[in-house]
């Protein structure tokens, strides 16, 4: 059911059946460290490159979510996944062995929400019993992609924000759980004229709520 300017309310709500999280060492040392399913001892995750490490995180997150739900990959109708790298290479390489039909997404820091929204819409519309949504980012690969490779030893201001090293996977389905997804609201592109590439927080946490999202 269409609601307001940019929202959908599901007549039959899907549920978040299971989830899993995999993070790097720095994230594990933070206040939420005890809540993650897997915390790496080092940010390469046993791989040779940051990009391979990000793929490994996605694979582990998906396998953990499936394992917690006692499901095989064949139980998933579609996978919605993305990352911060060109051509979604971390996702493509990370989920290859699962052999689940995949929609590759790229929404930068909104990819997790985008994947969950599309997975929920697909379940609510009856296109499958279960969907898998997954996303990831890696500080090392993101710095290399968008700012300065770590080997360049660029000095960062103390106020600079860090891209998280982590991956989250979510199984969305029809089985009842303690988390129900009743609808989605889709955002728009808004340019606030921000120029500081180190200040990601302003980009992530601003919204046009006052103008557009009241009564969505």
For every predicted segment, state its role.
Residues 32-35, 91-101, 123-124, 146-155:
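A glycine- and small-aliphatic-rich helix-loop capping segment at beta-alpha/alpha-beta transitions
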């Amino acid at each position: 059911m269409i609601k307001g300017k940019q929202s959908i309310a599901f007549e039959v709500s899907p549920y978040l059946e299971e989830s899993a999280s995999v993070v790097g060492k720095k994230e594990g040392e933070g206040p939420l460290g005890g809540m993650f399913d897997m915390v790496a001892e080092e940010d390469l995750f046993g791989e040779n490159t940051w990009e391979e490490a990000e793929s490994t995180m996605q694979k582990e997150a998906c396998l953990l979510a499936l394992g917690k739900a006692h499901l095989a990959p064949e139980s998933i109708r579609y996978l919605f996944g993305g990352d911060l790298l060109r051509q979604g290479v971390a996702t493509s390489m990370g989920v290859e062995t699962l052999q689940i039909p995949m929609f590759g997404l790229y929404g930068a820091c909104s990819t997790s929400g985008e994947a969950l929204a599309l997975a929920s819409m697909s379940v609510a519309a009856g296109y499958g019993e279960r969907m898998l949504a997954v996303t990831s980012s890696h500080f090392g690969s993101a710095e290399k992609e968008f700012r300065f490779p770590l080997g360049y030893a660029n000095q960062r201001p103390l106020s600079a924000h860090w891209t998280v090293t982590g991956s989250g996977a979510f199984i969305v389905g029809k089985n009842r759980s303690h988390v129900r997804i009743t609808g989605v609201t889709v955002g728009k592109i808004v340019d606030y004229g921000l120029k500081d590439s180190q200040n990601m927080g302003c980009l992530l946490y601003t919204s046009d709520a006052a103008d557009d999202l009241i009564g969505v």
